[in-house]
């Protein structure tokens, strides 16, 4: 009996599943052939292994892709950048157009100047509404005076005086940084003495000449306003030959520690009126080594003569073919004597030699008609 009851229950479950599949088949076919239309998939609980699966929520698809909607357009006013107070500000387009028109009508150079003019015209209304005026951020108040560096020359009297004060303060600041540059027609501060910026220390060596000198801590002698006197002779301090540095044979000459400027004798023009001054240049002691240097020594005359005597003496013999004379020249004779001998040999061919003529006469035959017979 129990087995039959189980078989009937299984058959009932199979029939229920068949009916569910039959109902879901037409719905799937209609959704597939819709051609991109919105379709809702209705699914029922499908028993799996005697467990119930929750029914999924319907999902809408449009052409197989999810559509992203654009946000609505923003409704904002158009703004234009206008120059003002040294930076850019934003304002509605109608206000910007009006400012541009006022700039052309008033003949201003920039829109910022037009905005400044508008603020000046509306100053009473601004004070009545806020209790304060339109003071720029770059303006400063000194001793109850408002100073605006960028104020135009067409402003009121106090503002123009504030500009002048600002220019003077900037000029003073530049003169403090550069005290040596004095401009013609400037204030007395520009031509102030250097003592206002640098300490002046009088040199004790130059107190006799007035002491108007500035000490220079560079190791050099102080320079006076009159300059060096004329007619000075430089004398370099070099150790003598008998000093220990030279006598030792090391040839180590220490560098001069001072250079003294000594005036010329009293016979020079104007030398008696000028005081004697000494100019000293201090330097670190340095040594110069000449041991490795080679210097030319004195020439020994005796060795030179001995070398001349040891040289071989060449003999030149010149024979005169015409006169038969022989001239002997040693190596010590000069080339001029040799040239003279050659000239004499050549001239011998020009001079008549009676002996040669007589020999020629003897060789000639005597004719029959000659008177000698």
Swiss-Prot record:
Gly residues bias (residue ranges): 28-38
Comp. bias regions, Basic and acidic residues: 325-345
Tagged with keyword DNA-binding: yes
InterPro entries to which the protein is assigned, alphabetical: TF_TCP_subgr (IPR017887), Transcription_factor_TCP (IPR005333)
Domain of life of the organism encoding this protein: Eukaryota
Residues covered by the TCP domain: 75-129
Biological process, per Gene Ontology: positive regulation of DNA-templated transcription
Annotated function: Transcription activator. Binds the promoter core sequence 5'-GGNCC-3', especially at sites IIa (5'-GGGCCCAC-3') and IIb (5'-GGTCCCAC-3') (essential for meristematic tissue-specificity expression) of the PCNA gene promoter. Can target the TCP motif 5'-TGGGCC/T-3'.
Name of this protein: Transcription factor PCF2
The organism's taxonomic lineage, starting at the top: Eukaryota, Viridiplantae, Streptophyta, Embryophyta, Tracheophyta
Gene, per the UniProt record: PCF2
